[in-house]
C-alpha cells in the first residue's frame, strides 16, 4: 500500500512539474535569439549601433542586453546559436568563456545604478533546460539574494576546491559548490569544470543550472544544481538572485 502511495505521489509531482514547464514555455522561446540575431547584431554591423542591446562584440561572440525584469538585471548572450547548458558547443575549447565575459560585464549594473555596486552583491546564473524560458543561452547578471549571500559568507571556509554538496543546499534545493580563483575562472569555463569533474555530468549537462558568486576573500564559488522533479527542482539557478536588488538598500 505504501509503495502504491509513493508511486502515485511521484506521478502527481512529475505531472505538476511538467505543467509548470508547459506554462513556462507557452510564450515565444526564441524571443531573445531574435533580438540578438535580427536586431542587435545587424545594427552593430551595419550602423555601429548595438541597440536594442547595450553592447555587441561580434568578434568576441557575445552581446550584453538589459533585461526588462528588475532595474539592474542584464543578460550576456552569444551572437550565434547556442540553446543552453545542454549544448556541446559549451564544452569546446574554442567557445568563449561566457561566464568570465559576464563577470566583466557586471559594470553595466553600476552604470545603470549610478553608483559602484560591490562585487559581493553581484551574481551570475544560467538555468537548466527545464528551468529556463528561452532557448538561447543567456547568463543572468544581477543581484544576489541577501539570505543566499549570508549563507555563502558563513560557508566560506567549508567550500572546497572540489565539487562537494553545499551544506543545507540553497532555496530548499541541493547544490554542489566549488571554490576557484579569479585566474582559474578566467582561464577555464565553469561549464567545462562541471562536465569534466562531476561524474556523469557531461552526458546530462542540460539538467544543470549554474551560478557564480564572488566571495569576501577574492575567490569565486561555483554552484550547480541538478534537475529533480520529485523535489520540484527545475534547476533554475536564477532562484538565488533578487532582481529587485534589496541587498543594495
Curated annotation (Swiss-Prot):
It is found in: Cell inner membrane. It comes from the Bacteria. Keywords: Cell inner membrane, Cell membrane, Hydrolase, Lipid biosynthesis, Lipid metabolism, Membrane, Phospholipid biosynthesis, Phospholipid metabolism, Transmembrane, Transmembrane helix. GO terms for biological process: CDP-diacylglycerol catabolic process; phospholipid biosynthetic process. It is a single-pass membrane protein. Its main location: membrane. Pfam families: CDH. It catalyses: a CDP-1,2-diacyl-sn-glycerol + H2O = a 1,2-diacyl-sn-glycero-3-phosphate + CMP + 2 H(+). GO terms for molecular function: CDP-diacylglycerol diphosphatase activity. Pathway: Phospholipid metabolism; CDP-diacylglycerol degradation; phosphatidate from CDP-diacylglycerol: step 1/1. Its EC number is 3.6.1.26. The chain crosses the membrane at residues 5-25. Belongs to the Cdh family. This is CDP-diacylglycerol pyrophosphatase. It comes from Salmonella arizonae (strain ATCC BAA-731 / CDC346-86 / RSK2980).
Amino acid at each position: 500500500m505504501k509503495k502504491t502511495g509513493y508511486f502515485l505521489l511521484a506521478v502527481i509531482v512529475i505531472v505538476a512539474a511538467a505543467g509548470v514547464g508547459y506554462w513556462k514555455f507557452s510564450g515565444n522561446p526564441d524571443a531573445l535569439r531574435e533580438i540578438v540575431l535580427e536586431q542587435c547584431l545587424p545594427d552593430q554591423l551595419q550602423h555601429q549601433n548595438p541597440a536594442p542591446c547595450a553592447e555587441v562584440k561580434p568578434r568576441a561572440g557575445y552581446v550584453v542586453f538589459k533585461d526588462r525584469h528588475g532595474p539592474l538585471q542584464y543578460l550576456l548572450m552569444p551572437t550565434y546559436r547556442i540553446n543552453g547548458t545542454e549544448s556541446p558547443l559549451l564544452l569546446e575549447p574554442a567557445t568563449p568563456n561566457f561566464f568570465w565575459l559576464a563577470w566583466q560585464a557586471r559594470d553595466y549594473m553600476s552604470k545603470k545604478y549610478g553608483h559602484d555596486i560591490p562585487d559581493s552583491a553581484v551574481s551570475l546564473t544560467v538555468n537548466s533546460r527545464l528551468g529556463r524560458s528561452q532557448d538561447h543561452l543567456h547568463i543572468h547578471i544581477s543581484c544576489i539574494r541577501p539570505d543566499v549571500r549570508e549563507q555563502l559568507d558563513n560557508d566560506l571556509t567549508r567550500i572546497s576546491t572540489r565539487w562537494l554538496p553545499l551544506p543545507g543546499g540553497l532555496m530548499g534545493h541541493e547544490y554542489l559548490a566549488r571554490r576557484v580563483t579569479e585566474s582559474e575562472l578566467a582561464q577555464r569555463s565553469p561549464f567545462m569544470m562541471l562536465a569534466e569533474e562531476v561524474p556523469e555530468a557531461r552526458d546530462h549537462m542540460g539538467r544543470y543550472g549554474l551560478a557564480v558568486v564572488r566571495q569576501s576573500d577574492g575567490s569565486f564559488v561555483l554552484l550547480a544544481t541538478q534537475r529533480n522533479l520529485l523535489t520540484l527542482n527545475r534547476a533554475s539557478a536564477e532562484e538565488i538572485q533578487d532582481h529587485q536588488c534589496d541587498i543594495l538598500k
